[in-house]
UniProtKB/Swiss-Prot annotation:
<keyword id="KW-0964">Secreted</keyword>
<dbReference type="InterPro" id="IPR001542">
    <property type="entry name" value="Defensin_invertebrate/fungal"/>
</dbReference>
<dbReference type="GO" id="GO:0005576">
    <property type="term" value="C:extracellular region"/>
</dbReference>
<protein>
    <recommendedName>
        <fullName>Tddefensin</fullName>
    </recommendedName>
</protein>
<keyword id="KW-0044">Antibiotic</keyword>
<dbReference type="InterPro" id="IPR036574">
    <property type="entry name" value="Scorpion_toxin-like_sf"/>
</dbReference>
<comment type="function">
    <text>Antibacterial peptide mostly active against Gram-positive bacteria.</text>
</comment>
<dbReference type="Pfam" id="PF01097">
    <property type="entry name" value="Defensin_2"/>
</dbReference>
<dbReference type="GO" id="GO:0042742">
    <property type="term" value="P:defense response to bacterium"/>
</dbReference>
<feature type="disulfide bond">
    <location>
        <begin position="10"/>
        <end position="32"/>
    </location>
</feature>
<keyword id="KW-0929">Antimicrobial</keyword>
<feature type="disulfide bond">
    <location>
        <begin position="3"/>
        <end position="24"/>
    </location>
</feature>
<feature type="disulfide bond">
    <location>
        <begin position="14"/>
        <end position="34"/>
    </location>
</feature>
<keyword id="KW-0211">Defensin</keyword>
<keyword id="KW-1015">Disulfide bond</keyword>
<comment type="similarity">
    <text>Belongs to the invertebrate defensin family.</text>
</comment>
Length: 36
């Protein structure tokens, strides 16, 4: 729901889940991926 328009929100969402961050990726960058 954050991507592809708001990669910063995706990043912050991942931070809140305890991950070190995240990015928009996949087809057309529509998926928010969290770093492990």
């Amino acid at each position: 729901r954050y991507c592809p328009r708001n990669p910063e929100a995706c990043y912050n969402y991942c931070l809140r889940t305890g991950r070190p961050g995240g990015y928009c990726g996949g087809r057309s960058r529509i998926t928010c991926f969290c770093f492990r």
